[in-house]
A protein has these predicted regions:
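Short, surface-exposed connector motifs at secondary-structure boundaries
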Residues: 183-191, 321-327, 349-354, 398
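Nucleotide phosphate-binding/pyrophosphate-handling subdomain across enzymes
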Residues: 38, 134-137, 145-158, 162-163, ...
Length: 423
């Protein structure tokens, strides 16, 4: 098996679909020797900010001298990004070897595992093989029935900002969504919650109390954002002053406050994480595709906001960083997301839209999206490919700012097309 064959196996059609439940993952991991039983975890769930928060946690723990696994989704440029140790992606040859190990176990299962469950097993094998001290484990969808929830009680569970997303799978209210996320809370294991949504906070507090899990809610009253430019945002939080965070979204200091709170909980459990490591980790963190500046002048931004809750934060960042400016938006949206609400947020900042369809069956066709924008009084033109869309958006932008957003699923293609355009 070569690398391409390994990826084809992982992405094979027979694994497609979302099937909640932990039985298949437990069966698969058991056949592989239960590698997750050798590991310790920080488990991260949430609607938005969970990937950024996970990246910050991993960066700080690495700065403190630990060997740190990081499991996230989706990938931006290469599949291997999803499984990292100390910032290094799983090597191609290791991925091939582990797929060859997982394949007979997965093929023998009568209840066929999902693609995500297979990837979770691959991650656990690699983290165990590389002897990670701790793994920052990002939930795929929800919490309770997500395949990552097979782990024993983690060192800490972290629940980031909650909002309305995946309502078909998780339920139509914030309480339903909070209930799914709170499923990662394990008996006696501490939990850190971003908080701020009373309906959701009540569910998390109740679940933590029932499971005797010590709960810490992030105290955002202790957060002061000093200033922000196109290179970093500077903030103070809870005695850590003047931290320059290279993730420039206005919302990122709040994710950092969540990470700091969780790291201090770990410290109280005996982990050696000095404030100097927290500062170094935050000032070195990289997390592509989240309010990421690909070019300073003229500005070209790439952002992965893919639901109304995330889009609201992105729009606020655009207003903060570029007051009074109009954008050319390169936009792709999944048809099952809150399109109306996202467009309502973007239209006041838009000079023009160029619409494209990301390479996934869930993406709204570019022409349909353009029609929806025009129906709301916006100017929009569809592009037949992402490459054509990037070129058109840059041409329309001239010396003004361009922002590509609406889904993480086109981030890699946008980055590639933009790089090609600037060769």
């Amino acid at each position: 098996m070569n690398y391409e064959e390994a990826l084809n196996y992982i992405h094979a059609v027979q694994w497609a679909g979302h099937k909640p439940g932990l039985t298949r993952t437990r069966t698969l991991l058991s056949a592989l020797g239960d590698p997750h039983k050798q590991l310790r975890f920080i488990h991260v769930a949430g609607t938005n900010g969970k990937g950024s928060t996970a990246a910050m946690l991993a960066s700080c723990l690495q700065a403190a001298g630990y060997r740190v696994g990081l499991y996230t989704s989706p990938f931006i440029n290469r599949f291997n990004e999803r499984i990292q140790v100390n910032g290094q992606q799983i090597p191609d040859e290791a991925l091939v070897r582990l797929v060859e190990r997982v394949k007979p176990a997965a093929d023998a299962m009568t209840d066929i595992p999902t693609e995500f469950e297979i990837i979770t097993a691959l991650g656990m094998l690699w983290f165990a093989e590389t002897k990670c001290d701790i793994v920052v484990l990002e939930v795929g969808l929800g919490g309770t029935l997500d395949s990552t929830n097979v782990i024993d009680p983690p060192e800490c569970a972290v629940i980031t900002a909650l909002g309305m997303d995946h309502v078909k799978e998780l339920g139509p209210t914030l309480a339903d969504i909070a209930s799914a996320k709170a499923g990662i809370i394990k008996p006696g294991s501490p939990v850190v919650s971003y908080g701020g949504v009373p309906e959701a906070d009540a569910v998390i507090a109740r679940t933590a109390a029932e499971r005797h899990a010590p709960l810490t809610v992030v105290d955002l009253s202790r957060l002061t954002i000093e200033d922000g430019d196109l290179d970093a945002v500077t903030f103070d939080f809870d005695g850590l002053n003047g931290i320059r965070l290279p993730l420039i979204g206005s919302y990122q200091p709040r994710n950092a406050a969540t990470a700091i709170t969780a790291l201090r909980v770990l410290r109280s459990r005996g982990w050696n994480i000095p404030d100097s490591a927290i500062r170094a980790g935050l000032e070195q963190v990289r997390w592509p595709g989240r309010f990421e500046l690909l070019r300073h002048s003229p500005v070209f931004l790439l952002d992965g906001s893919h639901n109304a809750h995330g889009m609201r934060a992105t729009v606020q960042s655009l207003r903060d960083r570029f007051p009074g400016q109009k954008f050319v938006f390169l936009l792709s949206i999944m048809a099952d997301k809150g399109v109306d609400e996202m467009l309502a947020l973007l239209l006041p900042l838009a000079g023009q839209f160029v619409t494209v369809a990301a390479h996934t069956p869930r993406a709204m066709p570019a022409e349909t999206l353009a029609e929806q924008i025009r129906a709301r009084g916006g100017r929009a033109e569809p592009a037949s490919t992402i490459e054509a869309g990037v070129a058109r958006a840059v041409a329309l932008g001239g010396t003004g700012p361009v922002c590509a957003l609406g889904t993480l699923y086109f981030s890699g293609d946008v980055r590639e097309a933009f790089a090609k355009l600037n060769q």
